[in-house]
Regions:
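Arg/Lys-rich, low-complexity, intrinsically disordered basic segments
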Residues: 1-101
Length: 101
C-alpha cells in the first residue's frame, strides 16, 4: 500500500483526509480529525506541559475503541498524524515510516 497524500478534508466536519493506493491499484480515502477541536499539533504550539497532558488524556480515552494498527483507519490516522509529534509534517513522516508507506 502507498500513501498518496494527506490534505485538508472535503468533508466539512473533518480536518484532514488521507488517500492510499492499494496494491491492486484501487484507492481508499479516509477523512479524520474533528474540525473545530484541538489536537496535539495545535496544543504543542503553546504550553508544552498542557500539550503533554492533553495527549495523555486523548490516548487514555481512545485506546479502548480505536484501531491504531490499520493505517487506513480514521483512528490510526488521528493517533499517528494529529496526536503523535508536535508538527503535522513530523508526524506524517513518522506515520509513513511506521507503516512502511
Amino acid at each position: 500500500m502507498k500513501l498518496l497524500f494527506i490534505k485538508p478534508s472535503t468533508n466539512s466536519d473533518k480536518k484532514l483526509m488521507a488517500t492510499f493506493e492499494r496494491y491492486n491499484g484501487r484507492t481508499i480515502t479516509t477523512h479524520f480529525g474533528a474540525k473545530g477541536l484541538k489536537d496535539f499539533t495545535i496544543y504543542s504550539k503553546g504550553d508544552k506541559q498542557l500539550a503533554k497532558e492533553k495527549k495523555a488524556s486523548y490516548l487514555a480515552r481512545h485506546i479502548v475503541n480505536e484501531n491504531w494498527i490499520d493505517p487506513t483507519s480514521a483512528g490510526a490516522l488521528s493517533r499517528w498524524v494529529l496526536w503523535n509529534l508536535p508538527t503535522k509534517e513530523a508526524s506524517i513522516a513518522d506515520f509513513k515510516k511506521r507503516f512502511n508507506l
